[in-house]
């Protein structure tokens, strides 16, 4: 039986996430929560058979138990996530946070998803689009040899940056920098985001620079990065290396691009697509652990 889910936020990310959850073998999107009764996201959700409310999380709370909602995705804003999380936690709902609020531990699926399941976290943070794209590369390098400093530059199309993204720019840089260190393994991390107004819009591009201790092991680092890219491609097929890794002294540079699947968002919105795909991937693994727990025979 599929695990019932609610999506909080009916904007670009929430609507694209709904499309991905509808394909999931273990997740069932049951609710879409918004605040604008006329939003396109709520209209699409109703057409897809989901229950909807435009009264925010408060409109969902009375129905959580009756509809068996076990997992909620918060695709709203860092500024309201704390309150949403408090209300959902009181109802025993697992929260996947797609905002930069970072109340719970970071989750970058190919790097530390198993750790998050093992530590019993009830709120996990999906970092940022830049974090999901670049932290795996930093981690791949640091698995080979220590990284003293890592700097990432995420360039996204202005068209793919909605009001939520623009409002959370400062949180984006802080949260991504922390994830580079805490998940990627760099001693010091820095993140930069660039909104590119070019027309036609360009797909997401990311640059990852790592300064390693000692002379870089070219072969081992290249193989580690290639393995990590293959892991990300399992849930983001449009994730690929554009150039690199290249080596200049102790600096290792990798140039990436991320093309979206085009579920609800245009193909150039790879920055949003990698967030929804990573969140769906994480939730599927959590759902499987919930199913395993419920299927396990009771012991005296």
UniProtKB/Swiss-Prot annotation:
The active site is at 129 (acyl-thioester intermediate). NAD(+) binds at residues 10-13, 160-168, 271. InterPro entries: Acetaldehyde_dehydrogenase, Acetylaldehyde_DH_C, NAD(P)-bd_dom_sf, Semialdehyde_DH_NAD-bd. Gene3D superfamilies: Dihydrodipicolinate Reductase, domain 2 (3.30.360.10), NAD(P)-binding Rossmann-like Domain (3.40.50.720). The keyword ATP-binding does not apply. Its EC number is 1.2.1.10. It is an enzyme of class 1 (oxidoreductase). One of its GO terms (biological process) is catabolic process. GO terms for molecular function: acetaldehyde dehydrogenase (acetylating) activity; NAD binding. Keywords: Aromatic hydrocarbons catabolism, NAD, Oxidoreductase. It comes from the Bacteria. CDD domains: ALDH_C. It catalyses: acetaldehyde + NAD(+) + CoA = acetyl-CoA + NADH + H(+). Pfam families: AcetDehyd-dimer (PF09290), Semialdhyde_dh (PF01118). Belongs to the acetaldehyde dehydrogenase family. HAMAP family: Ac_ald_DH_ac (MF_01657). This is Acetaldehyde dehydrogenase. It comes from Alkalilimnicola ehrlichii (strain ATCC BAA-1101 / DSM 17681 / MLHE-1). The lineage of its organism: Bacteria, Pseudomonadati, Pseudomonadota, Gammaproteobacteria, Chromatiales.
């Amino acid at each position: 039986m599929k695990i019932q889910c609610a999506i909080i936020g009916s904007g670009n990310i929430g609507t694209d996430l709904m499309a991905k959850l509808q394909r999931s073998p273990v997740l069932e999107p049951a609710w879409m929560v918004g605040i604008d009764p006329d939003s396109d996201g709520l209209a699409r959700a109703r057409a897809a058979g989901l229950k909807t409310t435009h009264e925010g999380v408060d409109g969902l709370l009375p129905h959580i138990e009756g509809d068996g909602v076990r997992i909620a995705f918060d695709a709203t804003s860092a500024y309201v996530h704390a309150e949403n999380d408090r209300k959902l936690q009181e109802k025993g709902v697992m929260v996947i946070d797609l905002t930069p609020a970072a109340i719970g531990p970071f989750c970058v699926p190919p790097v530390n998803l198993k750790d998050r399941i093992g530590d019993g976290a009830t709120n996990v943070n999906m970092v940022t689009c830049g974090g999901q794209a670049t932290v795996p590369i930093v981690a791949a390098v640091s698995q080979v040899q220590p990284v003293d400093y890592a700097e990432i530059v995420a360039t996204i199309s202005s068209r793919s940056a909605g009001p939520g993204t623009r409002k959370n720019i400062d949180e984006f840089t802080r949260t991504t920098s922390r994830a580079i260190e805490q998940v990627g393994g760099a001693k010091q991390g820095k993140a930069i985001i660039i909104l590119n107004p070019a027309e036609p819009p360009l797909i997401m591009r990311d640059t990852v620079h790592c300064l390693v201790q000692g002379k870089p092991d070219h072969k081992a680092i290249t193989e580690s990065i290639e393995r990590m890219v293959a892991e990300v491609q399992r849930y983001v097929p449009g994730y690929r290396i554009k150039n690199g890794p290249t080596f200049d002294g102790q600096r290792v540079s990798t140039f990436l691009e991320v093309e979206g699947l085009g579920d609800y968002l245009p193909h150039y919105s790879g920055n949003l697509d990698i967030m929804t795909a990573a969140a769906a991937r994480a939730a599927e693994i959590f759902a499987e652990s919930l199913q395993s727990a419920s299927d396990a025979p009771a012991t005296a």
